Amino acid sequence: MPVAPTYPGVYIEEIPSGVHTLTGVSTSITAFIGYTARGTVNDPVHIFSFADFERAFGGLDGASPLSHCVKHFFQNGGTDAYVVRVAQGAAAATVTLRSATGPVLDVSAASSGTWGNSLQLDVEYATSNPASLFNLKVTEYIERNGTMVPGRAEMFRNLTLNGFDANYAVAMVNAQSQLIALTKNAALAFAGNGRSTSDTLTLADVNPMPAGYRVAYTINGVGPYEITVPVPTAPGATAATGATAAMNDIAAAITAKSPPGVTAAIVGTNQIEFTAVTDLAHPSERSSIHFFDAGTNSVTARLKLGLANGGTEIDAAATTRPLSTGTTGTVVLPVAFAATGSVTMDVLKGAGALPIAAGIVVPIWGAPTARPVPASLDEAVAQLNNALSGLAPAQPLLAGATAQRIGNTIRVLPGSDDPNVSFRFTVGATATSFGLDAATARNVGHYAPGVGVTALAQMQGAGGNNGMPPAATDLSGNEAAKTGLYALENVDLFNILVMPDATVGAGLMGVLTEAIAYCSRRRAFMIIDAPETVGTFAQAQTWMGSTASPLRSRNSAIYFPRLREPDPTKNGIVGTFPAAGALAGLYARTDAERGVWKAPAGTTANIVGATGLSYTLTDRENGALNPLGLNALRTFPVIGTVSWGARTGRGADALADEYKYIPVRRLALFLEESLYRGTQWVVFEPNDEPLWSRVRLNLGAFMHTLFAQGAFQGKTPRDAYFVKCDKETTTPNDVDLGRVNIVVGFAPLKPAEFVIIQIQQIVQALQT
């Protein structure tokens, strides 16, 4: 860059070289559009292997020609693809979760399909703040050997429904989950205020209070605020009244120095409770108050404020938490551990009031068990787990049931495969101490999208539906909505398009013509199979000579016949499949091995995986179809099944099109896309000879690299290509209009389609 000399000496100035390296784009990124067993609808998914396809779309499916095409693509050399799932009537499994007061969260599977009916959700409060936050676990169950077993699982911790919090459940889950999506229920309403309550204080805690000591806190997520705690007035006649008087002084001082909206009161047994009055801009949702240590001279711990110091903090949003799954009881402290301990429970299903198993007695310790009286609550919970496990053989409905301590609560979770099962406890001494009695908060064992019934804190949603194979309108989609074909608007670059569903039904010619036009716009190439109704040479000849006219494009190639191979989805019965996926893989393999300028045809262009073809063409039949621009698939002894044609949709002899051959057209598309992306730097540069020379330099270097790789005809660069950008291509009028005109020419390599060998006898001269 230019320097500004100010002192005598030597200066270094860096001068731009004018080099902008132009890199060729990929040539074989393939887009597949059509029906799959499952997956997100109208959302392009980038995959790099068939295993990726299986994970995202469910693998091979008898109703999905696309699934077989994707398999063939990767078998034949493809490495990079996008898949757009299109289906009629596809729906995601849903369910609504309730709090103690009403519906709060709508849950849907991440994509449509019956797979979402196998999701189970667990909500529990074992968080950093059990009084305010919740954890959400999502598990996908999959079938394995006839049994549903856990598959993918996700865990989201310390969530809240306060939309202004960093741990806002909807934002956090939707940003990270591959299994579900959350939405706030329309009926969700916030009420009340956030509050922070100290642990029990004594006179020694609050008086005497050293001068200059401080506390820190946030209010409604704003802060932190730090204030100095005043020295309280002299205590009263007794320790209790003295503590109360000192606490009143401290509370009054803190509220006086706080922003408007903070109130304080003495509650319980010598506890200070601070309340954050509703934020008027966002009533109750963000109402909260949290104490923590001040930067210096902190007395937050001495006043037992904040979670870390034994206090409790409950945000207003806590009342909107979805109820914990399972059955949760509040322990009566201190727990009275009698000589024997047991609970009695019923097992219920769904909304039914009548148990499916009633009066199950669960001995926890003492007679008739050999377990000793527990010494602590944690030990009692461990013994409850042992008791539940021990009863499982005789009571199968208790199989897998577990108990968990969360703060001063005990949560008992069913282990049943049925998510609608719940436990109800009946009154008893041990049950009451544990909080596991008739008044216990009972909920379904697991929230279940799609199959969960309306019961307790669960509201039944819609079942997941895979949908049906798409109609023409589904495949074409809508450009404004970016659906169907136009879902590819969300893909930066693709080179090849395959739509197998558009060739397996009636009335789909319009879809193909629209897709070809879209390919022309995106500088892509479409591979098309002759319709499944075209099964013989005569039908192919008739169809190609008339019906296929709308498909004649430089940006398409049409192939006949189809592939045959055993179908794994039908017990290995040999089936017929579109060849487009295998051909796209062949294109990719040829590009990698030889270059985009090599025709994807010939004896080396074998189709991997195919055991045969739906029709066997003879040389004469092939010779009749080739001049029409219909590319043949052939099977030869030893060689196997190969691609035996290299013509575009405009490749009929009668059309005499300059882009008759596939490699010529695909090379041109490669050049166009590469030059388009590689010359963006030219925009807004000064439009004169220095710019034009840099254009010639950079584009010339790119074209010369291709020449050296054998992409063009000619022995010398002059014979093979040219780049022109000067005052002849860009006139003064062009400059005034803001235009730079660049002319790039190339001499394409055309395939040797017909090999003619001339043979003659050598005749000895006759002696006369």
Where are these regions (language model features)?
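Short, flexible domain-boundary/linker segments around small modular repeats
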Residues: 195, 317-326
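Catalytic P-loop NTP-binding/switch module of NTPases
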Residues: 194-202
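Long, low-complexity, polar/charged, intrinsically disordered or flexibly structured peripheral segments
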Residues: 447-476, 481
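Structured, hydrophobic secondary-structure cores that serve as assembly/anchoring elements
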Residues: 1-96, 105-110, 129, 199, ...
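Extended, beta-strand-rich, solvent-exposed assembly scaffolds of outer structural proteins
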Residues: 55, 94-190, 203-302, 307-309, ...
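Basic, gly/Ser/Thr/Pro-rich low-complexity segments located predominantly at protein N termini
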Residues: 39, 44, 63, 440, ...
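Intrinsic disorder/low-complexity signature
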Residues: 171, 182, 245, 306, ...
